[in-house]
Amino acid sequence: MTQRDSTGIEPKISVELVDDLRAADLSDLCDAAELAITDGGGFGWLAPPPRDVLEAYWRGVLLIPERDLLIGRLDDVIAGSCQLLRPTRNNEAQSFSCNLTTHFVAPWARGHGLSAELIRAAEDRAIETDF
């Protein structure tokens, strides 16, 4: 269920598959990730890494052919993400499967259905890519 803000207006949520991040989007993604990590939902990190490490991580994700980065926005600001991870070509034994990883939503954006939309978009992408 989507919560309305104090003005009674329902926030706008959107999810998109990205293959490039503008500087402002990279900054928003790092901000959201840092808050999620601090809140305990840090997809492996116990404390936020230095900002340059986090930026390098997200840039690196975009370079890996087996990873699809989906970002979630709340009122046009990146507030979360998830990745669809396909097996590498040499992993024939698991060529039929893919995994969802690094799924998070910043604490300030929770309660609006963004997490569910990220999962739905990842499932749709898995189907589109024959998984």
Sequence positions of predicted segments:
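Short, low-complexity, intrinsically disordered N-terminal peptides in bacterial proteins
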Residues: M1-S14
